[in-house]
């Protein structure tokens, strides 16, 4: 399935139905009074967050959504039926913005969450509504009110427990494939991953979701390599696993490059817990491993994990470290 994390759509709620002009007609009643019913309300436009989706690709093929017009009023004081609603089904984590793409309307963070984006127009009053002591037989009715029309932006920020970050070719996709059933594209060239991937990891009977985002480069927070959109997908994570490839000549510089982008982007990433790991260590001998591990520790201020998704070295330890931070974060959220 192709990935799409931002799109523009056009919505319009339904017009209200017109009120009816009608008079009571019955045998032996010569002057029946007005009995025109009111028109029905127009259909609303809703958005609903559902599980099972992790892309907005469906909105590439349909960008226009319109609620149905309310049914017109009828004689015998019958009110028209409400127009059918239309619902946009979006992945959990989708944000809805006004046309300026800056003003947030709603953040769809929970499965089943619904929000009315546009209310249908009210139905018009039938002529029975206008009967008075001075006008016993009004011969007019109101038209229904028009529905709301607006342009909105949908922006997806995936919801995962842990996010994988690092430079291109840091081994993020290989890590994800090794510990989950996700099958991201893996190859030995930069920017193999062009969109985020999700996988469910299990360790000691506990499950959590990991997001692999495309590799970050210098200037990502300013949109270089559309990195600012990639970074949005790890905003909601509880912990970051920062992978630094052992194949980097300067592991300290590789670490600080990504760390700078996270800090500069903001969005809470600067304060998010992180676990640093030296990845792809199967390519190093013992002396090289010791030297690069020491250099990385000096740069990040803590002892990095040593992992290789190819040989499975350190994978369980990395997953347990992620699980512990995630569990602590969830416990803190429940107490808050």
UniProtKB/Swiss-Prot annotation:
Its EC number is 3.6.5.-. InterPro entries: G_OBG, GTP-bd, GTP-bd_Obg/CgtA, GTP1-OBG_CS, GTP1_OBG_dom, GTP1_OBG_dom_sf, OBG_GTPase, P-loop_NTPase. The keyword Transcription does not apply. Keywords: Cytoplasm, GTP-binding, Hydrolase, Magnesium, Metal-binding, Nucleotide-binding. One of its GO terms (molecular function) is GTP binding. It is an enzyme of class 3 (hydrolase). GTP binds at residues 166-173, 191-195, 212-215, 279-282, 308-310. One of its GO terms (cellular component) is cytoplasm. Signal peptide: none annotated. One of its GO terms (biological process) is ribosome biogenesis. Residues 1-159 form the Obg domain. It comes from the Bacteria. An essential GTPase which binds GTP, GDP and possibly (p)ppGpp with moderate affinity, with high nucleotide exchange rates and a fairly low GTP hydrolysis rate. Plays a role in control of the cell cycle, stress response, ribosome biogenesis and in those bacteria that undergo differentiation, in morphogenesis control. Monomer. HAMAP family: GTPase_Obg. NCBIfam families: Obg_CgtA, PRK12297.1, PRK12299.1. Belongs to the TRAFAC class OBG-HflX-like GTPase superfamily. OBG GTPase family. This is GTPase Obg.
């Amino acid at each position: 399935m192709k990935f799409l994390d931002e799109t523009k759509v056009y919505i319009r709620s339904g017009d209200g139905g017109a009120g009816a002009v009608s008079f009571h007609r019955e045998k032996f009643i010569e002057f029946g009074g007005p009995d025109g019913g009111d028109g029905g309300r127009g259909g609303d436009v809703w958005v609903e967050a559902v599980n099972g989706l992790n892309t907005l690709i469906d909105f590439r093929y349909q960008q226009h959504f319109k609620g149905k017009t309310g049914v017109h009023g009828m004689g015998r004081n019958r009110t028209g039926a409400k127009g059918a609603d239309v619902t946009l089904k979006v992945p959990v984590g989708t944000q809805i913005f006004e046309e300026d793409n800056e003003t947030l309307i709603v953040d769809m963070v929970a499965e089943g969450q619904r929000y009315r984006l546009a209310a249908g127009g009210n139905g018009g009053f039938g002529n029975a509504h206008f009967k008075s002591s001075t006008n016993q037989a009004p011969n007019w009715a109101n038209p229904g009110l028009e529905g709301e029309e607006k342009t909105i932006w949908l922006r997806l920020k995936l919801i995962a427990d842990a996010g994988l970050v690092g430079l291109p070719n840091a081994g993020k996709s290989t890590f994800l494939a090794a510990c989950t059933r996700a099958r991201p594209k893996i190859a030995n060239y930069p920017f193999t991953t062009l969109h985020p991937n999700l996988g469910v990891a299990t360790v000691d009977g506990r499950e959590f979701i990991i997001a692999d985002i495309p590799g970050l480069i210098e200037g990502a927070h300013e949109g270089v390599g559309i990195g600012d959109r990639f970074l949005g997908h790890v905003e909601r994570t509880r912990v970051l696993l920062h992978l630094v490839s052992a194949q980097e000549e300067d592991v300290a510089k590789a670490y600080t490059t990504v760390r700078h982008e996270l800090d500069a982007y903001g969005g809470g990433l600067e304060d998010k817990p992180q676990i640093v790991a030296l990845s792809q260590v199967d390519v190093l001998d013992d002396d090289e491993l010791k030297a690069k591990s020491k250099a990385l520790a000096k740069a990040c201020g803590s002892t990095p994990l040593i992992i290789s998704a190819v040989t499975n070295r350190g994978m369980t330890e990395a997953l347990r470290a992620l699980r512990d931070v995630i569990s602590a974060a969830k416990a803190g959220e429940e107490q808050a």
